Amino acid sequence: MSDPQKKHFALADTPFDTGTLRAGLLDDRVGGYASFEGWVRDHNEGRTVRGLRYEAYVALAEAEGERVLGEALAKFDILDAHCVHRIGDLAIGELAVWVGVSAAHRDAAFAACRFIIDEVKQRVPIWKHEQYADGDAGWLHPDRPQNS
């Protein structure tokens, strides 16, 4: 697993501290900070969810995640950006994905944050396996459109 403190994109198989990650993005140049946190919810498409598991092709996911963050750093007027995505079993209410972006101004931070989460969800090979309250389970693939 990557160390979330050393790369722009990381996978984590245990909970991580967003405060520490946020602090790593802040310095005297920063005038705006934007973040996104995605949490495991108890429902999807009309079904009650009791938990889920994220699986990834780790080497490819880390490489593609780094590409996404590199694109954001090149495309937007931002100072720094990081994204961490959990893998493994997660319970309802657990943090699944975090994105943080620092910039001199808020507009760039907000735009880059949205770009990063959208591109990570679209391009990074991470698969979600939901377990439902009725005992059924199902895979949701990154290439299948999901409701936001």
Residue ranges and their predicted role:
Residues G100-S102:
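Short hydrophobic/aromatic beta-strand micro-patches
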